[in-house]
């Protein structure tokens, strides 16, 4: 009798397949500020968060509030950050996108006003303000997609810090192993044809081949539902 394949085991929700969120430092959210006002804060430390690839900044605001924010390029310990409608449009400040000039780079963008920031949060990425209309602002996302947002949505001016991360090779499998331990993923990932017959429908045999058709019905049972699921066609397009 075969064993449960990885896709079945993942559904059980054991710690192997769950993100270690107890190690994550905080949910990074823009501070709430009254309209037509702004507050200033000072960066007292730059830290690493296992939850993300970009560094985070510990900021103490003039109200006494201490908050962790996503760090942008150019931010250092001792830098001053402004947040609010009256804040200057300069790197690191949190301002409404409706007040950002066209062509400026922004990151950590809100989807709705005061939701804290949803888009463009990975290291080294940025979006570009394209144009403004009376009640909406067009922003070019890193994917190239144009997204229309409420001009009251806030964003950080500049580029997320930590750029160039994807250009650096891992060099050692141990480095990749420790990185994957912070994610909800199983590493290393073994192909089905390299497994034993009890572990996967494509396992076993004298050499690495599935040994059976790789197309499978949409209604196949969970242990067999691997390969090209409900494929309309297979092979090279002619």
UniProtKB/Swiss-Prot annotation:
Q: Which InterPro entries match?
A: NA-bd_OB-fold (IPR012340), Rib_uL2_dom2 (IPR014722), Ribosomal_uL2 (IPR002171), Ribosomal_uL2_arc_euk (IPR023672), Ribosomal_uL2_C (IPR022669), Ribosomal_uL2_dom3 (IPR014726), Ribosomal_uL2_RNA-bd_dom (IPR022666), Translation_prot_SH3-like_sf (IPR008991)
Q: Which UniProt keywords apply?
A: Ribonucleoprotein, Ribosomal protein, RNA-binding, rRNA-binding
Question: What's one Pfam family here?
Answer: Ribosomal_L2
Tell me which SMART domains the record gives. Ribosomal_L2, Ribosomal_L2_C
In alphabetical order, the GO MF annotations are: rRNA binding; structural constituent of ribosome
Note down the stretches annotated as region Disordered: 203-223
- Biological processes, Gene Ontology terms: cytoplasmic translation
Instruction: Decide whether keyword Transit peptide is in the record.
Output: no
Give the signal peptide range: none
| Highest taxon above the source species | Archaea
Looking at the UniProt record for this protein, which Gene Ontology cellular component terms does it annotate, in alphabetical order?
cytosolic large ribosomal subunit
Family (UniProt): Belongs to the universal ribosomal protein uL2 family.
Q: Which PANTHER family match?
A: LARGE RIBOSOMAL SUBUNIT PROTEIN UL2 (PTHR13691:SF16), RIBOSOMAL PROTEIN L2 (PTHR13691)
- Share what the entry says about its subunit structure, partners included: Part of the 50S ribosomal subunit. Forms a bridge to the 30S subunit in the 70S ribosome.
What is the role of the protein in this entry? One of the primary rRNA binding proteins. Required for association of the 30S and 50S subunits to form the 70S ribosome, for tRNA binding and peptide bond formation. It has been suggested to have peptidyltransferase activity; this is somewhat controversial. Makes several contacts with the 16S rRNA in the 70S ribosome.
Q: What is this protein called?
A: Large ribosomal subunit protein uL2
The scientific name of the source species is: Methanosarcina barkeri (strain Fusaro / DSM 804)
């Amino acid at each position: 009798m075969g064993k449960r394949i990885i896709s079945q085991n993942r559904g059980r929700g054991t710690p192997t397949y769950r993100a270690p969120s107890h190690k994550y430092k905080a949910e990074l959210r823009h501070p709430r500020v009254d309209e037509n006002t702004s507050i200033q804060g000072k960066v007292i430390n730059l830290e690493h968060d296992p939850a993300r690839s970009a560094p985070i900044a510990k900021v103490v605001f003039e109200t006494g509030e201490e908050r962790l924010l996503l760090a942008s390029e150019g931010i250092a310990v001792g830098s001053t950050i402004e947040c609010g409608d009256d804040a200057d449009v300069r790197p690191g400040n949190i301002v409404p996108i409706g007040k950002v000039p066209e062509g400026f780079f922004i990151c950590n963008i809100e989807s709705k006003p005061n939701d804290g920031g949803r888009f463009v949060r990975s290291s080294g990425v940025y979006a570009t303000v394209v144009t403004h209309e009376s009640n909406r602002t067009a922003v070019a996302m890193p994917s190239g997609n144009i997204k229309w947002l409420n001009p009251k949505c806030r964003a950080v001016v500049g580029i997320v810090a930590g750029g160039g991360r994807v250009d650096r090779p891992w060099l050692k499998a141990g480095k990749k192993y420790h990185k994957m331990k912070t994610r909800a993923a199983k590493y290393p990932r073994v192909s089905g044809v390299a497994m034993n017959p009890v572990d996967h429908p494509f396992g076993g045999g004298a050499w690495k081949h599935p040994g059976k058709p790789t197309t499978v019905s949409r209604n196949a049972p969970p242990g067999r539902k691997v390969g090209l699921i409900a494929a309309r066609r297979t092979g090279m397009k002619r």
